Amino acid sequence: MNKLITKLLFATIAMAGFTACSQDLIEEQKKNTKENPKHLTEFFATNSAKTRTGAKYVTIPSVLDGLLFYWNSGDQIWIDKDNNGVFVKNDGSDIQSGSKLEDANFFFNDQLNATSYKVRYTGNNSSAANEVTFAETQIQTAPNDASNIGKYGDCGVAVATKNAQGKYQFTLQHKAAYMVLSPYSTYGFASSVGVVAVYVTASKPISGKFAFDDNGVGEAKTGAKNTIAWFYKQELLGRKHISSSNSNFRDPQNMLPLPTAADVTQNGIIITMPPGTYEDLTIEYGLIDTATGGYGYYKQTFKNKTLVAGENRVLSRDIKLDTEFDPNEYYAWDAVQDEYYWKGAPNKLRVGRNMPSESTGYATSASDPRFQNEIPGGSTSNVADNAATRGATVAFNHNEALWLILNGEAKWDEWKMYVMNKHLYNGGIWIKTLKQIALERRVTVESLKEGFLGMDFRACPCTNNPHAKRTFNDADANYERPAKADRSKYMFMPAAGYFGRPTLASQQNLRIMLFCGDQGF
């Protein structure tokens, strides 16, 4: 097929929506030096910048400028030999295995004499002239590379005209649409964060078999789907399998980075799609962090977006997550406010899964304001004696915690992502707010602070509390994010883990991040 842009040059300008852009690539053209074999008719495909018609050209600075298509091994064309709507495939070409040509020769085992012939291209290794297949799975092996689009649905039409040398010359008009994604993040993620997959969902079919004629792509055929899955270098076994794409399975070279500004030369994602207007179009970026094991999907939606045949649409998206956890929020219990756990030793704050242990940098005695409050709580009937007096005064008290446990209707959300210390994490619970619980019970929030089911547990030793522990309701509904309409009733608490001792008795003087992504306190 004709290959789209091997290297797209992207403007440093950030584009908020779809913009028609294109780009001229400079690559040494491989010249065809073969003679026209006897008893064969030669069709010569030209792809020069002056005659190219498969893209829209612009000269505005800082915008993509032009498209360049290539012919690769496996490409073939069809011609309407007898002008009766019956197309025949070429019998040979000068495209060698591994070749990438701007111009190519196709040979037909016949002496053809008409002034012109209709030409169709329906993809690499195609089997029909009246049908094109848009691949449900598309794999890209380098940033901003489109060397495989012939396998994924690239197609085109032309009219080949006989020249003075007796050869038929044509320039293909491309009829597929090319969506070029360029995600970035002004947050400034660590280099271990990147994109490994993109899932595209539309309001009408975008993959499978489509009718094809001289006007281009037609209606979807039976079995066509509304989804396309794009992967970088290696295919995921399924959406949920992105959870295994962590440092144990994936080298950082096998993901596309998230620069701080849009730059397709670093991470251009090219997806071949049927042209048309899509009432709803959803793009989900599959993100991973090879340092922390964090993962999840970032969703972007569009309404009434049009993809034009033969043109690329560049979409640049600033990926911003709505939850950020401050790494300086780790405290020993009721330590002095602003005297967080690793204060004064920021190089020790290595947060994530499988992080090394630290033997120094944390408080070891009450003389250090970062040390925990050693006054035992919950041991007397005096509420004041059991109360936090320093940094933990803003924490939920015993009664409030019980209301959250018993009436918060907690829902575990594996896919909720958050950021901390420039890294990506996922996992946490949604739990109803005290305000919502009070509203449902027709009481005040203040009354929830003062007692639980008629008893003030701030003055009750924890050993006598029958409600101190509750098993999580393992129903499927509690592993789903609250419906969007109900989300304001909940608060999200990230499973940010905690710093504790390793399990070995010989390591009791060490501190290590435990249960990050699994537990939170």
Where in the sequence are the language-model features?
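Conserved positions within compact, well-structured domain cores
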Residues: 216, 323-521
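Sec-type signal peptide cleavage vicinity
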Residues: 2-12, 16-406
